């Protein structure tokens, strides 16, 4: 599944630290698309692990995180101008 994760964290000293930590966390799971937007192709297990980590990081009374779950049919119907359409990472064979 493709998870489109969009977040908004206040521009305060503490918020800036959380935003940086959230960016670093999401960078380990997916592709940074634009400011505060990540595309993450994840298994159910990976997504559960990411959710747990995000829930520990964000402040529910200050931050906003929206996660859109897109199945393969929806991803194939994505219209993209400019940069390439989201692609599922390929397998690495060693």
Swiss-Prot record:
<keyword id="KW-0378">Hydrolase</keyword>
<dbReference type="InterPro" id="IPR021127">
    <property type="entry name" value="CRISPR_associated_Cas2"/>
</dbReference>
<keyword id="KW-0479">Metal-binding</keyword>
<keyword id="KW-0460">Magnesium</keyword>
<comment type="function">
    <text>CRISPR (clustered regularly interspaced short palindromic repeat), is an adaptive immune system that provides protection against mobile genetic elements (viruses, transposable elements and conjugative plasmids). CRISPR clusters contain sequences complementary to antecedent mobile elements and target invading nucleic acids. CRISPR clusters are transcribed and processed into CRISPR RNA (crRNA). Functions as a ssRNA-specific endoribonuclease. Involved in the integration of spacer DNA into the CRISPR cassette.</text>
</comment>
<dbReference type="GO" id="GO:0046872">
    <property type="term" value="F:metal ion binding"/>
</dbReference>
<feature type="binding site">
    <location>
        <position position="8"/>
    </location>
    <ligand>
        <name>Mg(2+)</name>
    </ligand>
</feature>
<comment type="similarity">
    <text>Belongs to the CRISPR-associated endoribonuclease Cas2 protein family.</text>
</comment>
<keyword id="KW-0614">Plasmid</keyword>
<dbReference type="Pfam" id="PF09827">
    <property type="entry name" value="CRISPR_Cas2"/>
</dbReference>
<keyword id="KW-0051">Antiviral defense</keyword>
<keyword id="KW-0540">Nuclease</keyword>
<dbReference type="GO" id="GO:0004521">
    <property type="term" value="F:RNA endonuclease activity"/>
</dbReference>
<dbReference type="InterPro" id="IPR019199">
    <property type="entry name" value="Virulence_VapD/CRISPR_Cas2"/>
</dbReference>
<comment type="subunit">
    <text>Homodimer, forms a heterotetramer with a Cas1 homodimer.</text>
</comment>
<protein>
    <recommendedName>
        <fullName>CRISPR-associated endoribonuclease Cas2 1</fullName>
        <ecNumber>3.1.-.-</ecNumber>
    </recommendedName>
</protein>
<dbReference type="GO" id="GO:0043571">
    <property type="term" value="P:maintenance of CRISPR repeat elements"/>
</dbReference>
<keyword id="KW-0255">Endonuclease</keyword>
<dbReference type="GO" id="GO:0051607">
    <property type="term" value="P:defense response to virus"/>
</dbReference>
